[in-house]
Amino acid sequence: MTANVLFPLFANLHDRAVLVVGGGKVAERKTEALLKVGALPIIGAPSLTASLQRWAETGRITWRQGTFENSWLQEDIWLVIAATDQPEVNHAAARAAHAQRLFVNVVDDIALSNVQVPAVVERGPLRIAISSGGGAPMVARYLRQQLESLIDDSWGRLTTLFAQRRDTIRARYPNIEARRRFFETQLAGPLQRLLRKQRHAEAEAVLEAALAKTPPTESGSVTLVGAGAGDAGLLTLNALRALNEADIILYDRLVSDTVLQMARRDAEQIEVGKSATGHSVRQEDIHTLMLQHARAGQRVVRLKGGDPFVFGRGGEELEFLRTHGIPYEVIPGITAALACAAYAGIPLTHRDHAQSLCLITAHCQSSLDTLNWAALAQERQTLAFYMGVAGLPTIQQRLCEAGRTETTPFALIENGARAQQRVLTGTLKTLAHTAQTYAVRPPALLILGEVTALAEHLHWFGTTPLSAPCPPRTHPIS
């Protein structure tokens, strides 16, 4: 059974009653966590651990001695935690809480719980919660341990430093975008390093000096970012930084949802993708959007699949931005030929097979008509055709006519570097027939050359490459 997706939420339980059903070690841990946030725990159990007993005697908690009763919920309870080793008692407490529409957490029971208590990293007022939805708590605990080693106490002190000056910062930067950029600048500066060295006075002086400066005039900019091809893990660190600083993200159709989820949550995302068969946004309209938002002082990310300068019209966009005086930068990405080849186990160059690589766009018939097919037919080179699914029959015909041998191996990679990747292999003679037989659909990349034969024993990702089917007795190229 798949657990429901949980909505992440932090609760203010200060001076609010929480019923903990159970008096053992698990209940003790839950109660201790509640006391840390100022809650008013009410413990319902026949007996208590030594620590719970001591807290009850000193008035830190209230003890309802006995087995769970519905009447315990007559008090002003905000949350119920069932933490006994008796399933029937936990069930009774959960049913009663559900009947009164109370949030209830039953320890180690996803089905009975409507809230889960996450693993937490605490650094002063800074709290980072990690949850597996109750399905795999050990994963959450493991990740918490990893974060514990990465996030030291200075981050808690930095959080406190900002919190103490919250009103001053808001008054100095009333515009939310300007305020966000101020925080980003300070977070990238020396504050945290000074606090790590226990140099609190210097950190305070640095922040005060920053607040005393006249807020800079905001100017917009555009960053062309390559999202890589397929696997979101191929996104570069610079690309991730740009996504987290963006106000507006203009993204192409092939950019994955996983990559978009890495962006700053409140950044506006606008799809401007192009499709040969579906809705497309004109390049002129993309130019207008970049100009409009940059002139409004916003940081625009033009997010493209693969690399912006490899069949991505990035050059045209930079020329437009330069003409209109808009600041820009370019963050390269891993282009489809590199990503697809790597994930298919195909070295694009190889001392024994290929000394050069040619990247070719096969987007439309006019693109194919301009190619030097005689040069492409030369041996000992690897050809990578982008956007060429519809043009495969033409590619096969023109290469054969130009003298490329029909036995030249190829690999057709559909959804490269993605979980659903499919690799089809064969020879130039069977190229169009193979694509038709396996109903290949975009996005797909054609790699042609002797190196593609290596995919058969070098592949490592996804399913085994599929061999070309037997061609029909007659298969004129059309």
From Swiss-Prot:
Q: Please give the Gene Ontology molecular function terms for this protein.
A: NAD binding; precorrin-2 dehydrogenase activity; sirohydrochlorin ferrochelatase activity; uroporphyrin-III C-methyltransferase activity
Coding gene? cysG
Q: E.C. number, please?
A: 2.1.1.107, 1.3.1.76, 4.99.1.4
Binding-site residues, NAD(+):
K25, V26, P46, S47
Where on the tree of life does the source sit, at the highest rank? Bacteria
Q: Which organism is it from?
A: Xylella fastidiosa (strain Temecula1 / ATCC 700964)
Main role?
Then it catalyzes the NAD-dependent ring dehydrogenation of precorrin-2 to yield sirohydrochlorin. Finally, it catalyzes the ferrochelation of sirohydrochlorin to yield siroheme.
Which BP terms does GO give this entry?
A: cobalamin biosynthetic process; methylation; siroheme biosynthetic process
Binding residues for S-adenosyl-L-methionine: G305, G306, D307, V310, T335, A336, M387, G416
User: What family is it from?
Assistant: In the N-terminal section; belongs to the precorrin-2 dehydrogenase / sirohydrochlorin ferrochelatase family.
Name of protein: Siroheme synthase
Q: Does the keyword Oxidoreductase apply?
A: yes
Entry-linked InterPro entries:
4pyrrol_Mease, 4pyrrol_Methylase_sf, 4pyrrole_Mease_sub1, 4pyrrole_Mease_sub2, CobA/CysG_C, NAD(P)-bd_dom_sf, Siro_Cobalamin_biosynth, Sirohaem_synt_dimer_dom_sf
The protein's UniProt keywords, in alphabetical order, are:
Cobalamin biosynthesis, Lyase, Methyltransferase, Multifunctional enzyme, NAD, Oxidoreductase, Phosphoprotein, Porphyrin biosynthesis, S-adenosyl-L-methionine, Transferase
**Residue ranges of region Precorrin-2 dehydrogenase /sirohydrochlorin ferrochelatase?**
1-207
Which NCBIfam families does the record match to this protein?
cobA_cysG_Cterm, cysG_Nterm, PRK06136.1, PRK10637.1
Known pathway = Cofactor biosynthesis; adenosylcobalamin biosynthesis; precorrin-2 from uroporphyrinogen III: step 1/1; Cofactor biosynthesis; adenosylcobalamin biosynthesis; sirohydrochlorin from precorrin-2: step 1/1; Porphyrin-containing compound metabolism; siroheme biosynthesis; precorrin-2 from uroporphyrinogen III: step 1/1; Porphyrin-containing compound metabolism; siroheme biosynthesis; siroheme from sirohydrochlorin: step 1/1
